[in-house]
Amino acid sequence: MALPLSTCLLFHPKESRSRRFCFSPASAASLKSGLHSATSAKIASMPTCFEQTRGRIAKLFHKDELSVSTYDTAWVAMVPSPTSLEEPCFPDCLNWLLENQCHDGSWARPHHHPLLKKDVLSSTLACILALKKWGVGEEQIKRGLHFLELNFASATDKCQITPMGFDIIFPAMLDYARGFSLNLRLDPTTFNDLMHKRDLELKRSNRNYSSETETYWAYIAEGMGELQNWESVMKYQRRNGSLFNCPSTTAAAFIALRNSDCLNYLHLALKKFGNAVSAVYPLDIYSQLCTVDNLERLGISQYFSTEIQNVLDETYRCWMQGNEEIFMDASTCALAFRTLRLNGYDVTSDPVTKILQECFSSSFRGNMTDINTTLELYRASELVLYPDERDLEKQNLRLKLLLEQELSSGLIQSCQLGRSINVLLISQVNQAIEYPFYAIMDRVAKRKSIEIYNFDNTRILKTSYCSPNFGNEDFHFLSIEDFNRCQAAHREELGELERWVVENRLDELKFARSKSAYCYFSAAATFFAPELLDARLSWAKNGVLTTVIDDFFDVGGSVEELKNLIQLVELWDVDICTECYSHNVQIIFSALRRTICEIGDKAFKLQGRCITNHIIAIWLDLLNSMMRETEWARDNFVPTIDEYMSNAHVSFALGPIVLPALYLVGPKLSEDMVNHSEYHNLFKLMSTCGRLLNDIHGYERELKDGKLNALSLYIINHGGEVSKEAAIWEMKSWIETQRRELLRLVLEGKKSVLPKPCRELFWHMCSVVHLFYSKGDGFTSQDLIQLVNTIIHQPILLNDQTGAGLSKLHD
């Protein structure tokens, strides 16, 4: 007999189907171990600042906040006037440097991370050079030199974060300092080590020279000195006049070549920030997409629907126009592609594939990308929808291997900083590898994202920069508050479901297993909004009933009882007391009829029409498919694989769980819609994925029990000449094709007949079955107890780090 979803959620594939699943007192206690008797004081006080937090986040959509870069501002300050080499072009930048030196003599970012001393050294030396060039700030130069001398050892400290190009640029600036006759009393050993390291890197790059090396050298042009071929550098000039959207590189190019477009770009950058510049400009698209990504990953995007829609529309417009801000940056391109495609925009994967081919060929990867970019590209490469996207699929396999290698080597390099950053990054990479986006339920993914969220907002290129759009405590706070609010409602709904089981006497059926918590969990973990209560309970109740009836067909009922049950559903308006063959049939049919009528009444209020007959028809399809399998087993009939799948995708029992819930998620569904081929195709694709996954993992058990199975039938239908391994590979390829087609239909809104919230339910269920089978041997009951606990019973508590950050925000 087929395993319906709720049965799958209970059993290890090797466990016997006839085994009854019961909770011992210990396991029942384990299931609710996370339910705290008293809510923490921090969580209890959260609602008072919920709206304030939401308001602050909303402001991020209207104003991009990006930190000023002292390093880049110093290089812009070195730019001479177009009319006189003896005068600065941007005297206000010089004044900014004079006014923003720190008390210790450095030019560090406020509250900079202690592992950023190399960045501080580089920024401080650049500021000194700018002031010395124009003969101003003698006292500031003196204090800056003193800071460099005291902290020079950090330049070769392997424990410190090394900014991009530091080993080339910093020694070059020391050479410039000597040219300015600056008297730096530096430790000779450290100085010689720096120069030796620079020479080695230059020799290695010359030995392995490639287009990627040329790009890297162009990016760090200010550190190349006389070695730089400026004509080759200008190949990388963008439409806005910049080189790599980087003020320091562009300033160095203007100093060398007097290119007017470079100068125009610098004026634009200063217009944006006043008397200083950022490390990257422009960065608007990436910043806004980071905000959207944070909100979606943490489960709070519903509070910012209008703002997010505006960002998506603008990003799509820029994508279609070929905006360089998207297509010349790997992270931005990958994030834009993933966000747009997942939100139903028609975007080609070609730009992502091209960037992947460029970024990860040769040594360029180590110079211009880090683990965050690799992870972003990996997530984008998962979204293969079309048969002609084989290149993207191949790159996905490469990226997965690369991430696994970096994890195993322990050499994770990040452009992010923060407390326990390595632990957080490793957790994020592990989650991405272990649970592909299609194999994790939405609420489970969001809980994991909240738990491993790194709200440090620092990034590092040649220098560090930060933005609250990249991450902040407000995102984290709002997501925790929202998760716990929903979870409290979910616990009440689970209690209602458990009462329903007792009221309908389903607990009296000795052959049936207790699984209401798991059936409800699959709903709460996929569509969790409070207003979808009726849809969740419909999903869960029908999940309970499908497993009860599956058990009845498999071990609990005689042939006469099974036929009687089907006849009762067909006749519907019958006298239960006289027409039921047995007590068990009476309980099952009574519960089924009462539940279908209840769902029909609720749906009538939303739909404005009676849909009860449709729900009855859905149930009859399932019952007849189960009876057909029973008859096949009785008659020892061996169907073809096509005959089997035509019936088995229905007997997998997802129809009564998913299809009635479509009427309760909000949009109106006309009779034409539910009769449309799209509706039936979505159901078949979803159910086929589930059936094949089940049959692969249940092969050994069902073979031993002499039961029909897609895998065994595939081997039989090929004359026994196909090995089990080859058959499994073929089945997995089939699953992949079906899953991608399902996702394409769910995402392609313009061509769709069904409303998006309805299409998404099919994808949610597909994720449920993929999550269960994502582990080699399936989920054990203990795995599921832990998952149910985290989604329904265990609130997320603010840790000390988050609490401290929030205290500063809300004081």
From Swiss-Prot:
Residues 1-49 form a transit peptide. It catalyses: ent-8alpha-hydroxylabd-13-en-15-yl diphosphate = ent-13-epi-manoyl oxide + diphosphate. Its cofactor is Mg(2+). It is found in: Plastid, Chloroplast. It is an enzyme of class 4 (lyase). The keyword Plastid applies. Keywords: Chloroplast, Lyase, Magnesium, Metal-binding, Plastid, Transit peptide. GO terms for biological process: gibberellin biosynthetic process. Binds 3 Mg(2+) ions per subunit. Its main location: plastid. Pathway: Secondary metabolite biosynthesis; terpenoid biosynthesis. Mg(2+) 3 binds at N694, E702. One of its GO terms (molecular function) is magnesium ion binding. GO terms for cellular component: chloroplast. Its EC number is 4.2.3.186. Mg(2+) 1 binds at D550, D554. Pfam families: Terpene_synth, Terpene_synth_C. A motif (DDXXD motif) lies at residues 550-554. Mg(2+) 2 binds at D550, D554. Involved in diterpenoid biosynthesis. Catalyzes the conversion of ent-8alpha-hydroxylabd-13-en-15-yl diphosphate to ent-13-epi-manoyl oxide. The Asp-Asp-Xaa-Xaa-Asp/Glu (DDXXD/E) motif is important for the catalytic activity, presumably through binding to Mg(2+). This is Ent-13-epi-manoyl oxide synthase KSL2, chloroplastic. It comes from Salvia miltiorrhiza. The gene is KSL2.
